[in-house]
Amino acid sequence: MVYHSQFNDESAGFRLVGNVPILPLKTTHKGPAPKGDANSVDIIDEALDLFKANILFRNFEVQGNGDRVLIYLTLYITKCLLKIAPMNKADAEKALFLIAQEQFSIPGESAFPLGGLVTVPNTRDAADTLRQYFTQLRLELGVRLCQRVYAVDPSKANKWWICFSKRKFLNKAL
């Protein structure tokens, strides 16, 4: 059974850009996401917690807007794990920072892999907000992923994380 996001409740009042909710984050990185409560689980914690279970599935029925962010983060985790597999923690942190900052596609651009799941932002400002939000997510996820993958030994990646790096989620990649 696939695990879905706890942020699917549309009555929670999260701001939407297209059909992507701008969810609160526990982060120091600047961006459009509101500050999250330090004691609660945010979407990045949720994506990391559910990654190993969800990566095993080829199908994912979207039950709400929070699932769209969860799918994007799951694909991004896979990309990150492929990149950091042979690295130590310091090199991995640098590599993930660079990956987060590189140019990437957003909904409405031809290279965006989730074109059918995520609607195109209706204005240029909305597209810029979405790009900033995805960048903020990518930066914070890189930091937290390194904390988990290198928790035991900073000189090498944990094999129980890296073994999932070659799996394809929804047969897509970022």
Curated annotation (Swiss-Prot):
UniProt KW keywords: Actin-binding, Cell projection, Cytoplasm, Cytoskeleton
Compartments, as annotated in UniProt: Cytoplasm, Cytoskeleton; Cytoplasm, Cytosol; Cytoplasm, Cell cortex; Cell projection, Pseudopodium
Subunit structure: Component of the Arp2/3 complex composed of arpB/Arp2, arpC/Arp3, arcA/p41-arc, arcB/p34-arc, arcC/p21-arc, arcD/p20-arc and arcE/p16-arc. Interacts with carmil (via the region between the LRR domain and COOH-terminal proline-rich domain); carmil is required for Arp2/3-dependent actin nucleation. Arp2/3 complex, MyoB, MyoC, and the alpha and beta subunits of capping protein all form a larger complex with carmil.
GO cellular component, one term: cytosol
PANTHER family: ARP2/3 COMPLEX 21 KD SUBUNIT
GO molecular function: actin filament binding
Protein name according to UniProt: Actin-related protein 2/3 complex subunit 3
Keyword Cytoplasm: yes
Predominant place of localization: cytoplasm
Cited function: Functions as a component of the Arp2/3 complex which is involved in regulation of actin polymerization and together with an activating nucleation-promoting factor (NPF) mediates the formation of branched actin networks. Seems to contact the pointed end of the daughter actin filament. The Arp2/3 complex is involved in organizing the actin system in cell motility and chemotaxis, in phagocytosis and macropinocytosis, at late steps of endosome processing, and in mitosis.
Keyword Iron listed: no
Gene3D superfamilies: Actin-related protein 2/3 complex subunit 3 (1.10.1760.10)
Domain of life: Eukaryota
One of the GO biological process terms: phagocytosis
Stated family: Belongs to the ARPC3 family.
A Pfam entry, by short name: P21-Arc
